[in-house]
């Protein structure tokens, strides 16, 4: 199933993706304002991939409670302000990557809580 879903992602239009873009890795830089006031931590695993991945990391993190209406509003805000040319494609990638990322997070969490691997 995942292979079929991943085939739906546009692998030609790659962007820099930090892959760990969530609240714990954002910091406020006190003497700056606007976009310059946001600092990023833990970016050493950056790769080229779908721009939707980092937005998913921020808005759909299984470890955080983000109001679904707020997440939808922020997704629409991103689409309105960003350089996304195919909004339907972006939304589809967003959904696919949200599923993938949150399954991964939940498997890791369960594995740690049980102190044993899920798969051998």
Q: Which residue ranges define each predicted feature?
A:
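Helix-rich C-terminal or lid/interface subdomains of diverse kinases
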Residues: 1-8, 12, 83-120
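ATP-dependent phospho-/nucleotidyl transfer catalytic cores
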Residues: 1-19, 27-41, 49, 61, ...
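Residue-level signal for alpha-helical context at structural boundaries
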Residues: 20, 73, 92-93
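Nucleotide-sugar donor-binding/catalytic module of glycosyltransferases
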Residues: 23
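Structured loop/turn residues at beta-strand edges in well-structured enzyme cores
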Residues: 36, 53, 92
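Active-site activation/catalytic loop segments of kinase-like enzymes and analogous catalytic loops
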Residues: 51-85, 99-114
